[in-house]
Amino acid sequence: MRILFIFLSALPLVNTPITSDVINEGATIRFEHPLPAMNVDGRENGTYNNIELGIPGVLTTLDTNLGMMLKQLRDNVLEGRHVVFVDGRFIPVYKNWIRDHVHTMKAFRHWERDLRTYLDFTIEHQRPDGSFLELIKQMDDKHWSFVAEDDIVFFPEDNLYLARLDIESDVEYLVVEGATEYFKATADRRWLRKNLRKLEKAIEYSTTSPKRWDPEHGLVKRAYTIDTWDFSYEKSGHYDRRITEKTPMAIMHGDNSGVYQAMKQLAWMNRKLHRKAKARRWEQKAETLRENAIKYLWNGKYFKHQLPLGCPPADDKEDIRLSLSNTYDINRHFTTTGQSRSIVEEYMFRRDTTSAFAEWFTIDPRYWPKFGDSYAHPAYINGLITSFTAGELAKAAFSCGYEAYGWDILCRFYENMVKDGGNVYFLYDRYTRAPQNAKLGPAAWGAAALISAIDEGLAGIEDIDCRYRSLGFSPRWPVTPYKELRYCTGYELSADIVDVRYILTGAGMRYCIDSPAKDIQAHILLPEGAQVSKVLLNHRVIPFELTETGGSRYVDFSAGHLRGRTDIEILF
């Protein structure tokens, strides 16, 4: 013990790297600093115990800001995790609505060890027509009184019920999304074989049920609500969530992009089970749905809010009303690059012209003086600012050539988090920025969208197969001030981790990737004005393409037959 103490006391205290240089062997561009570290070149770049590092997480040589933002976002998501004891089951949930649970899965899929139980419970209670129930609530929560008897299953011993708010049309495609996330994280083909037909039946319900499908337009319909929310434009609509012959109906773009994504996911999962003909049929259905949506819902710049069916519009602004699902439409790959850019440009325009503190609207313009008999403006989903629009918009901007705008959104949102003690809220007042519905709303949903924007948008790491065996790699770090960093993501459940080192110098840029990937599809953003002389993969020159998205230039190439570490150098 005395010898160990003497040895440690003789070590230098700061700024002397104590690390192996194996990572730099054979490289043209060398990493300059070991990470993790607490102090680099006199700067505090890491916390004492590296509390900022998680999955996903980042360490930089500049500061702790982005790392702490991710940590606080993870904390906000974890705060929404609790358990439900129902029907002899112990079910971990991130909010006890399957909708919120799946939207939040964008984040917790990385660390949660039980991705399956709530999905299994929901799928097992699928109704004969293919539809799903959506929320587990206590008996003294009166949502059960808002719906018909056949939309409820009671569990009296647990003082709980399982219900479906009939006016919503998003539940089925969200369950498919959740199932896809589970399968990606596990590659559990046995589970997929058991459940794929049930998932298909759910989307068949969405596209055939008289409650959900409008055959005239060939599109999914819902009760006339604000975007994807659960109260309709009619008197008593706040407390009556049924669909009756008096319920006003409409077509909302977000339901259709959701079903489109579900169809593409069903095609992908069928291919994983070698069912190619069925996969092609789902892809054809998806393309027809997208064509119909563009024909009837696209206003030339973005998707209009609602297309009323057999009822008058709520006001004269539906064709110009920008609603939150436009950002989801982009991230579900429902739009072309040109359409995606047009939607993002509309948000950028409204940022410059709005009197609100940010452009992350639920809807804009809001309904005046209120929506039906609910929520006078601006209140709740009728016109407030929301965290999940911020996250989805940032992610969308990264993907369509507005990378600097995506980074700007993240920076502005982090400023809000700092002011709010690291907290993320569901809704914010348009003018004062004060949190709204702080205790009741799904704040974790917004935090998860922001994590996804950083993970898949900024860091550009996408699992395009299962367990990161095939890696989409589209990093966009040059739009940030960070010149050297380490980014980690993956699935703790399967112990599949992607660990990326990055450095940008005058000579070029380098990415060193430790991952399970056997192949990589690279689409790497270049710094503005950079001219590429060559690209090295594992120290060997490879062919590449230069592509453009908007004014942004990327290096594109594919690499296969990979094992372990992949080293990419782009020389200027």
Regions found by a protein language model. Give the residues of each.
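Sec-dependent signal peptide recognition
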Residues: 1-6
